[in-house]
A protein has these predicted regions:
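NAD(P)-cofactor binding segment of oxidoreductase domains
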Residues: 1-23, 60
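Mid/C-terminal beta-alpha module of Rossmann-like enzyme folds, strongest
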Residues: 18-21, 94-131
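SDR active-site strand-loop-helix element
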Residues: 23-29, 75-77
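Conserved catalytic-site region of short-chain dehydrogenase/reductase
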Residues: 29-35, 80-83
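Glycine/proline-rich active-site loop of Rossmann-fold NAD(P)-dependent oxidoreductases
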Residues: 33, 84-89, 115-124
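Alpha-helical membrane-targeting segments
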Residues: 37-53, 97-99
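Conserved beta-loop-beta element that borders a ligand/cofactor-binding pocket
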Residues: 62-84
């Protein structure tokens, strides 16, 4: 699987060419140093049997952003649901002792829109869940 890293490589190149600096990117719980902070099902079943190569590619995607020189923010949602927006969004940068919880796709979308113009989130990797 190279979908995420290929798309990120092309996006970063296009941004450099166009002089665009800001990128907010969604990867997922289990990418990079968030591995081990998901639910039991995510960590023991999905990551072992179904998503191993996908998350290896998400790791490559994140590494590209870290070295891109862009003003990036990586957002790693917890377990995504199709439920309604709740308005609850816990944002974490430190994961010690944390297990990600559920969050609706609507709440993630609302959070993404909110941080696009937030310079404090530049070069931050954030775990978001419903708390």
């Amino acid at each position: 699987v190279t979908l995420f890293s290929d798309a990120t490589r092309q996006t970063v190149e296009a941004m450099r060419t166009g002089g665009v600096r800001r990128l907010v990117c969604v990867t997922g719980i289990g990418a990079g140093d968030s591995r081990g902070h998901g639910t039991f099902f995510h960590e023991q079943i999905l990551m072992r049997f179904g998503l191993k190569s996908t998350y290896a590619d998400k790791d490559r995607q994140e590494q590209m952003l870290w070295g891109s020189g862009l003003d990036w923010t990586i957002v790693r949602p917890g377990y995504l649901t199709n439920g309604p927006k709740t308005g609850r969004c816990r944002v974490l940068t430190k994961l010690d002792g944390v297990r990600a919880k559920k969050i609706s796709r609507g709440d993630v979308g609302e959070f993404l829109v909110k941080i696009v113009g937030d310079e404090k989130s530049n070069r931050q990797t954030l775990l978001v869940d419903g708390g």
